[in-house]
């Protein structure tokens, strides 16, 4: 039984799963989970792809016919700030399967350029954003829920030393 988070990162584009990217993704997920008070060992599966790959997944899973920067597929229907409990752990591994995230590395590069910051910061931001979705946060409205999610994202980015 694992006592730490398990974060497998796979890629279907060459070079995306570099040691540096995998280390940043793992550190970001661990930091975001800790910031949200998640102490039980969790599994988060990460796929790094390109615009074509994420477009295909977006169409298949959400019937949205366009690429996006990040997709999150939570295992649980949680309210913001709610955590799955030990009873949700896989009996074989002892891990709580939080869900999956898919990131377009093309969007990471384009958005980093657009927003005038590093790819490293953009990747960490999108990973943080996805973790919060896995934990029940959302931003469908332009009101308090979106503000709450943005505040949590900025808090995690500050912990990572990657604030704006």
What are these regions (language model features)?
Residues 1-124, 132-164:
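An acidic/histidine-cluster motif and surrounding catalytic segment
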């Amino acid at each position: 039984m694992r006592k730490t988070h398990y974060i497998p990162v796979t890629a279907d584009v060459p070079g995306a799963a570099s040691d540096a990217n995998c280390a940043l993704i793992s550190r970001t997920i661990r930091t975001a989970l800790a910031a949200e008070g998640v102490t039980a060992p969790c599994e988060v599966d990460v796929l790094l792809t390109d615009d074509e790959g994420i477009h295909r997944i977006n169409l298949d899973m959400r019937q949205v016919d366009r690429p996006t920067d990040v997709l999150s597929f939570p295992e649980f229907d949680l309210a913001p700030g709610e955590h799955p409990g030990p009873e949700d752990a896989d009996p074989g591994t002892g891990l709580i399967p939080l869900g999956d995230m898919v990131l377009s590395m093309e969007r990471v590069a384009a958005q980093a350029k657009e927003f005038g910051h590093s790819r490293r910061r953009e990747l960490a931001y999108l990973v943080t954003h996805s973790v919060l979705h896995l934990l029940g946060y959302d931003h469908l409205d332009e009101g308090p829920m979106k503000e709450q999610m943005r505040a949590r994202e900025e808090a995690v980015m500050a912990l990572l030393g990657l604030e704006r």
